[in-house]
Amino acid sequence: QGKKRTGEISTLQYIFEFQSMICELTNMDVANASLYDGATATAEAVFMATSQTRRNKVLVSKTINPRILDVIKTYTKYRDIEIIVVDMVDFCLDKEALRTKLTDDVAALVVQYPNYYGVIEDFQEVVDLVHNNKSLFIMNADPSTLSVLKTPGEIGCDIVCGEAQTLGIPLNFGGPYLGYMATTNKLLRKLPGRIVGM
C-alpha cells in the first residue's frame, strides 16, 4: 500500500514539474499534463478556440508543416469547422492575405514558430490584427528553440502547443512523441486533458 502511494505521488510530482517547465519555456500561465503529439495538440487548440469564441472558421498559415495541417483537417472534418489556408510570401505569412480573410466569424489563426521552412517570423503585427478581430492566436512552437527566441507569451499568444519530442526523447520505430499545450488563465477551463496542481 505504501509503495503504491509513493508511486502515485511521484507520478503527480513529475507531471507537475513538466507543466511548470512548459510554462517557463513558453512564458504562459498554465500547461496541461501533455497530449498525444504536436499535431493533435494543435487540432485540440483549434477546438479550444472555436469553443471559446463560438465561431466556426479557423485560418491556418501555409507556412506550417503540411502534416500538421492534414491532422487539423481530419479532426475538424465532421465538426462544422471551416479551415482556410492563408498564403505565404517569401516563406512567411502573407499579411495582406490575412487581412482579407480575417472576418468576424474567424475563431483563430494557427502559425508555426519557427515555421516549416525554418524561418523565424515576426508575429507582433499579426497578433495585433488577430486580437483586434477578437480572434485567438494559436502558435505551434518548437520548445527546444524557446530558450533563445522571443517566447509565445511575450509575443501575445493565446494558445501555444507543439511537439516536445525535440526536448530529448529518443525515437524508436516512429515514436514516442509528446504533445504539449499551454495557455492563458482566461482559457484555463477550455484546456483539454488533465492538469496536476498543488
Regions found by a protein language model. Name each.
Residues G2-A41:
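Conserved N-terminal alpha-helix of the aminotransferase class I/II PLP-enzyme fold
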Residues T40-M198:
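Conserved PLP-enzyme active-site core in the AAT-like
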Residues Q1-G2, R67:
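Glycine- and acidic residue-enriched flexible segments with recurrent GG/GxG motifs
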